[in-house]
């Protein structure tokens, strides 16, 4: 439950060492380098755009080559591959890649060229297939496509509107020129768009025949070839077979290159590291002979960073407290159990300047409320075992994913405990199975009470847990006020609300309204009733008189105080939000019981048992998934809106040290490489 203390560091060294020092800082991964430094007359930024662009282009090319290999030679992966983590690379592996990077660059280029050639062949196949489809209506024509005629005849090859026959076309000609002779018309094929035809006429009448045909939609074919349509189609099919064979050969060549997949991944990450280095190099201030690096380092890492730099370089490292007017980046540190909830906090926002880290109390409430919403012992056991097994089996999974699984593992334990308290084990599975198949009813009795038998009791305790949650947020606000030494804010903004809300709750408890809801009657002694009145009145008076204490105008102060009292409606709204604990808790149990009843409808025979098992598996998997999602969403909502709304704003920037950011591999040790 802590924000790790941060220090500011400034490093000044000779310009000739700038690349080596940056590489050492990158391998250490402990210093966040500021990139928004202002230039002066003596210290200016050096443009590294061309060098950075060069390495980014190499990253892009190598990533593209890997995608090509994955496309044509997919890697066999298990369904849990995403949990296995990235492969590790040692310093020796990096040095091997550096030594052979030019050979690998040529391989990358070759892979890209092969991919382009394959794409060209695939386009050629499409082109040939389109041509074959276009020639299909002409296959019955037994003369070359480019035939224009003989010494005494003209040949007109073309198309007319669809649906015409030879009789129709000859009718067009005879009706226009009844006396004309010396021609013939043959329809060789047709489709939905055209009628394919050949007209042969002696030269003396061919021009007139064509004019008549054109008046009825005739168009000469624009395709020319010395082959017949059938011969041309055979040629295209041969070309397709040749393209396909060539593609197959090139694919096999790519498959043979897949053995270098891991090397190319390491190469891409090496170039990615180099690109990051030049990006930072272009942001630091440099003079003619020196350069300056400004940044942040965790207080615990200061001695190591300074010692490593002084051991290898001649430089000056100045470490000092972060100035008051600067917001230092945030790095959280919590016990492993509570650190699992840091992702929930980060989704809302890291602590701002002067704020505490609320991870630990938030994690306690998160885990407890999640279990209360799901509240089935069997579901909790399944969640716990699934997450526990995955964490143990895949210890190298990504840190963020491991934290999430660890959080759900603890939520599973909470769900198991609440399920035992409420008597839920796959709903009423034990009762239904014993009654249906063994004809003797056995029940899984709740340790506390069954929510379905007493929903108002669950509602009452849901609101009680909500009040504890809200008071927890208000208490943390008070803690931050006292930590800053602001006793006035503690009394006026925290203690006053504790007094008012506590007084109002104590005033409500002996009433008939509360008794009708809670199904229990409270009879307070007179002194306790008077105490509740006093708490409410004093708390309200402090709020009214002190909420606007920053303003000197008494009327404005009073108006602001009265407006702040109106925030009681906000407290009521927040408190009623916890009725979702009742709704989700009941929903899980009701749906589970319905599933069990549906499964038992087929009776107690073999067929009934088979039906029950199928309905049980499908139904409870669905119920677990949908209610687990609901519990996750609504638990997050209660943290973000109700809990954080009482004390926490967030807005801090995460600590992002300059390190070897990679995509494919985890580098187990730093490397020192010179360009």
Regions found by a protein language model. Give the residues of each.
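Long, charged N-terminal accessory/stalk domains
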Residues: 1-362, 390, 401-405
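Conserved, carboxylate-rich catalytic/transport cores that coordinate ions
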Residues: 2-7, 16-22, 26-33, 303-675
């Amino acid at each position: 439950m802590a924000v790790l203390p941060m220090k500011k560091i400034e490093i000044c060294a000779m310009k000739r060492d700038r690349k080596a020092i940056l590489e050492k800082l990158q391998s250490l991964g402990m210093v966040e380098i500021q990139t928004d430094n202002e230039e002066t007359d003596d210290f200016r930024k050096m443009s590294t755009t061309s060098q950075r662009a060069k390495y980014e282009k190499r990253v892009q090319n190598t990533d593209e080559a890997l995608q090509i290999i994955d496309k044509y030679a997919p890697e066999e992966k298990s369904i849990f591959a995403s949990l296995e983590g990235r492969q590790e690379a040692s310093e020796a592996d990096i040095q091997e890649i550096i030594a052979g990077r030019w050979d690998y660059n040529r391989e990358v280029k070759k892979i890209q060229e092969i991919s382009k050639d394959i794409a060209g062949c695939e386009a050629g196949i499409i082109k040939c297939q389109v041509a074959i489809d276009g020639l299909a209506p002409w296959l019955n024509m037994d003369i070359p496509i480019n035939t224009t005629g003989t010494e005494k005849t003209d040949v007109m090859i073309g198309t007319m509107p669809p649906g015409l026959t030879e009789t129709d076309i000859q009718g067009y000609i005879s009706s226009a020129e009844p006396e004309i002779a010396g021609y013939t018309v043959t329809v060789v094929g047709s489709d939905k768009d055209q009628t394919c035809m050949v007209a042969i006429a002696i030269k003396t009448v061919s021009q007139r025949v064509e004019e008549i045909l054109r008046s009825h939609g005739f168009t000469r074919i624009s395709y020319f070839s010395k082959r017949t349509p059938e011969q041309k189609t055979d040629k295209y099919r041969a070309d397709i077979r040749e393209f396909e064979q060539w593609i197959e050969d090139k694919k096999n060549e790519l498959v043979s290159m897949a053995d270098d997949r891991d090397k190319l991944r390491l190469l891409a990450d090496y170039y990615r590291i180099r690109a990051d280095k030049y990006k930072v190099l272009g942001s630091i201030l440099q003079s003619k002979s020196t350069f300056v690096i400004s940044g942040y380092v965790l207080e615990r890492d200061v001695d190591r960073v300074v010692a490593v730099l002084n051991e290898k370089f001649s430089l000056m490292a100045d470490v000092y407290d972060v100035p008051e007017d600067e917001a230092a980046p945030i790095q959280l540190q919590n016990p492993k159990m509570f650190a699992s909830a840091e992702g929930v906090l980060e989704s809302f926002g890291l602590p701002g300047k002067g704020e505490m880290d609320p991870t630990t109390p938030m994690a306690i409430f998160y885990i407890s409320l999640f279990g209360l919403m799901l509240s089935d012992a069997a579901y909790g056991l399944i969640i716990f075992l699934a997450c526990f097994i995955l964490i143990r089996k895949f210890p190298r999974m990504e840190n963020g994913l491991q934290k999430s699984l660890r959080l759900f593992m603890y939520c599973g334990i909470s769900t198991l405990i609440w399920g035992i308290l409420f008597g839920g084990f796959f709903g009423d599975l034990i009762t239904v199975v014993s009654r249906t198949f063994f004809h003797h009813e056995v029940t899984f009795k709740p340790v506390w009470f069954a929510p379905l038998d007493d929903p108002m009791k669950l509602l009452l305790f849901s609101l009680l847990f909500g009040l504890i949650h809200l008071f927890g947020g208000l208490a943390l606000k008070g803690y931050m006020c006292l930590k800053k030494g602001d006793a006035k804010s503690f009394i006026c903004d925290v203690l006053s609300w504790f007094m008012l809300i506590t007084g109002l709750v104590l005033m409500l408890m002996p009433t008939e309204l509360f008794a009708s809801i809670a199904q229990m009657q409270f009879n307070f002694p007179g002194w306790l009733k008077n105490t509740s009145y006093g708490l409410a009145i004093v708390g309200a008076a402090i709020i009214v008189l002190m909420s606007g204490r920053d303003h000197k105008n008494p009327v404005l102060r009073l108006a602001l105080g009265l407006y702040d009292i109106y925030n009681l409606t906000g407290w009521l709204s927040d408190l009623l939000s916890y009725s979702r604990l009742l709704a989700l808790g009941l929903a899980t149990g009701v749906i589970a019981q319905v599933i069990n009843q549906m499964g038992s409808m087929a009776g107690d025979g073999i067929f009934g048992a088979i039906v029950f098992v199928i309905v049980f598996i499908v139904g409870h998997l669905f119920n677990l998934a949908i209610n687990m999602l609901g519990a996750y969403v609504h638990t997050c909502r209660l943290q973000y809106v109700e809990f954080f709304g009482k004390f926490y704003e967030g807005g801090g920037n995460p600590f992002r040290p300059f390190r070897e950011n990679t995509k494919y591999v985890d580098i187990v040790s730093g490397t020192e490489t010179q360009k």
